[in-house]
Amino acid sequence: MALLAGVARAAPAPLSGERGRTDVASRYGSGAFGRWFVDGFGLPAYRYRIDEGRDPRARRSELEDAADPTDAWSQLGNDHVVANAYNHGYTQLWSQDRVYEWVNRYSAAEGQYAGGFGYLRAGGRTLSTLYADRPPGARSKRVFGAGYARRTLAAAGFAVDEHVYAPFGDDPVLLHDVTIRNRTRKPRSASWFEYWGVNPWEPAKARPRGLGTPSWDPRRHILSVRQAAEGPDRRPLRIFAAALRGPVGGHATDAARFFGAGGRAAPAAVAADRLDGRRAAAVAPGQVGRTLFALRAPLRLAPGAAVTLRYAYGAARPRAVRRIVTRWRAARRPLAGSQRRWARWVPQGSFGAGRHWLARELQWAAYTVRSGATYEECAHSHVISQGGYYQYGGFGSQIAFRDPLQHMLPMVYAAPALAGDVLAYSAREQPAGGGQIAYGAQSLCRPAELPPSNDMDLWLLWSAAEYGLATRDLALFDRPVPFRGGGTASLWRHLKLAYVHQESLRGPHGGYRTTSTGDWSDFSGAVLGMTESTLVSAQLAYVYPRLAALARARGDRAFAGRLSRRGAALRAAQRSEWTGRWYTRGYAGDRRLGTGVIFGEPQPWNILAGVPGRGQARTLVSGIRRFLTGVGAPAALGGPARIGSSMSPAAADPAVTERAGGPGIGGGNAVFVGGAWYAVNGWLTWALGELAGVVPRAGAYALDELERNTLAAHAAAFPGRWNGVLSVDDACNAWFAPDPGDCGIDLDHTYAGQIMHQPAWTLYAATRLAGIVPTARGYRFRPRLPLRRFSLRLPRVGIAVRPGSVRGYVRPSAGGRLEIEVARPRGSRVTAWVGGRRVASSVRAGLVRVRLDTRAGHASDFAVTVR
């Protein structure tokens, strides 16, 4: 018995049982606009500190066509809606349930001010909580948190503390908590006026939607208005606001009567301390109306006393509005509950005392990706759109098809139900019987009217493989999924048809034929004259074996064999594309592209597919570092890169002997597209990690690339740029560009940032560098980080490394026996553990193998220790 007790005491503590939060306290990467800190919920938050009305740094060159170029915002959201909380104090709500629309677009010129703020009337004074309209001498604070936006105002003996948030979960609603405190020694009477604008706007059409006449439900304290049925949306959502907590002493819906001569800063109705309840007139489509939702709360506060009011705002089906209001009226402390769920969900990473900022970055990245999810009624699914100017700006479309599929990759390990929804959403964009998938989607599941690309199928295939292998949810692939245009087939059938279509694009030189749009790099076909892409063949050389592993797990041996053979053939074909320094980009007719210049796109995929031998890998990494990262480049070019590596060398580099399609993103590029792309650098980070132990210092190079592609790195390098502090565009300028701190693709100067590539690829690349890889039989844990100690815990998988031990856990969506492979720690005697008990193991090729019996949704722990 004593011996057994000793064994039990020696068992490593289960990693899944650790509940402590890792340290994310660091100011590194704050930029010039404010400071990062850890809030009372234990989550990263950013305090915006500059006065945008006075400080010239607030003016953003990338918003030169915006109504207010000092706009700075942070993303709010849950699994259903997205919202932007602005430095000025208002919040805009975005909905994709039906048409893609801003529900309450800010337009000062037309008297629409978005919402999520209010006015306190007391002692004959009006106190606005908008930052621009704050009273003289008032003390204020603005915080952008992971899950909320907070504003505080102290003036005239009162303190107002506001939180706007989309409660964690799947309801299409924003909540606004307002706590008002009497800071004086005598009783005070006051009135709070809650304000929400109603100004639905479709970016794709660049026009407002029509509205009916607002209605008031006196029993439930709900204001609502129907949107006009027009175009393809014959069943539009109803916009609503409701008082959930606190007294109600009047309501208003007519903005002209509410603001009157006092305007935004001091509305006439607030000055009168009265709301008249008259209904705003209906609004014709294409016209901006004067509809608003205002609610008055009369208050009496004892000395030092405080009251918390709560309001809801959203857009939903008419029958759902009452349900949503009832649910959140009954909720106790919904803000704290929502934040607790975010705090439990975000990844917990530890990478050493000097990298608390990196742990913060991963939490913020995970929050950004998940809060960027929306629900689309036409697909009965959630999707994680690309965001940014593509979704919310002038394009107003869900483009491109491949984007949600890459954004779901890290969610496979953090929110698998959401990832599965994205997979099903994407599969239904496939035309009946297979064929070319459209470039993207418009609202109501309509195809985007843009030329297609030749890589759409492969992204569907890869994301499906990642999901199936990681979650073991093989039943999803039997689920019936509609085709675009009619008909239904199992998800597995969709994947087989995608494979057939992808292979129908084979070109004469072993690559895949392009259209004018090209492949990943949009318009590469037209700009480069490229008729055949070897980027796609390199990608498929990696993807097909992964899908083959899923096919084997499903028992589809015939398809698995077909995929494996094709993957081997592609690897062989890619080896012939070696130029002696790197791999080619493609063909223009019979002419090879990329013999005298390195294109960044295909290199990582050749590495991931296992194409280069050891010597070629060393040569390739040397070329990447020299030409794309700028290490050892001529000093006059401006390198090395302070943020991500470039996709192109510098046109002025004397060692470049081929140029095509420049000047590209930001200028100065030798080849199209150029610039530093967060997705492509995610591939590069991951690929460099795979060469750890093959190429000297490859693991260190991978960590270096990961860190340079963080928001913190951009804010540290270019502290005066807001674009890159809380979010960023899909691309930034290269290190040799005239303005290396600028970001964006120069197609829209009214919207910037909030694109999902950077957070999604930061989080996914981190899981790969941590060594987490699902396999046909289970999982492989082979750390690539050059750190003696680190840990990374996500909801569905985790790993912790220290000298002499590796601990981990998996929490699959479906149970069964898994084979776990763990890199053998250095030491003389290996012991394997499962669930705290010693188990039999084997060692092969440096990997310790154990069997793990799992239950759906439950954590199964393992460990490998040495003496």
Question: Language-model segments: which ranges?
Answer:
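Short, well-ordered beta-strand segments enriched in hydrophobic/aromatic residues
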Residues: 80, 174-182, 304, 805-812
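Extended glycan-interaction surfaces of carbohydrate-active proteins
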Residues: 143, 352-396, 421-443, 497-530, ...
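An acidic-aromatic substrate-binding cleft motif
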Residues: 27, 31-36, 40-49, 329-398
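Polysaccharide-binding surfaces and accessory modules of carbohydrate-active proteins
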Residues: 110, 165-274, 295, 327-351
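An extended acidic
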Residues: 17-38, 77, 83-154, 230-277, ...
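Short Pro-Gly-centered flexible turn/kink motifs
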Residues: 79-82, 188, 235, 299-317, ...
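Aromatic-rich carbohydrate-recognition surfaces in CAZymes
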Residues: 119-121, 397-404, 408-510, 533-538, ...
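Non-catalytic C-terminal accessory modules of carbohydrate-active enzymes
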Residues: 93, 98-162, 169, 670-673, ...
